[in-house]
């Protein structure tokens, strides 16, 4: 109730909306958390932390439209903070839940590269290359990973 008062009193303060999202997410209310994070993101569109938390809330919602929005938001965050392994993992989770397994494997390979787990990166790249019908751009990325980190 107190957070509702604060967001009503200070509607242009991204922190209060973000903190409301944090509380709602911790209370296992991902749809409401996502709404608070969306408001916070409108106020601070370049905040990687808000993008990450919005993405996590949308993943927890699990609806197809929520997953697509999570993928979009987490991709923006990844582009801004490419050396944050946790972002790559969350992006991979969103892709996997959306059924985009090849892309998920590549995102998880990127996480492995960032945290210096070369063996895992190579394993994930091999898994991509073992699939039939993989788009050439994904096959090329997997080959690059395997070449650099395959041992």
Residue ranges and their predicted role:
Residues 6, 39-40, 76-77, 111, ...:
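Canonical positions in the second alpha-helix
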Residues 19, 53-54, 90, 107, ...:
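Canonical tetratricopeptide repeat
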Residues 27, 61-64, 98-99, 115:
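Structural motif corresponding to the intra-repeat A-B loop/turn of tetratricopeptide repeats
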């Amino acid at each position: 109730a107190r957070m509702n008062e604060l967001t009503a009193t200070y509607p242009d303060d991204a922190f209060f909306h973000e903190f409301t999202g944090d509380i709602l997410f911790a209370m296992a209310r991902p749809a409401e958390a996502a709404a608070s994070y969306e408001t916070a993101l409108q106020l601070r569109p370049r905040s990687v932390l808000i993008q990450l938390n919005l993405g996590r809330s949308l993943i927890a919602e699990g609806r197809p439209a929520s997953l697509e929005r999570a993928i979009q938001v987490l991709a923006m965050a990844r582009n801004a903070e490419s050396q944050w392994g946790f972002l790559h993992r969350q992006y991979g989770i969103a892709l996997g839940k959306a059924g985009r397994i090849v892309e998920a494997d590549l995102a998880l390979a990127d996480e492995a590269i960032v945290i210096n787990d070369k063996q895992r990166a190579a394993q994930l790249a091999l898994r991509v290359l073992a699939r039939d019908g993989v788009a050439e751009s994904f096959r090329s990325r997997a080959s690059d990973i395997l070449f650099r980190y395959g041992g």
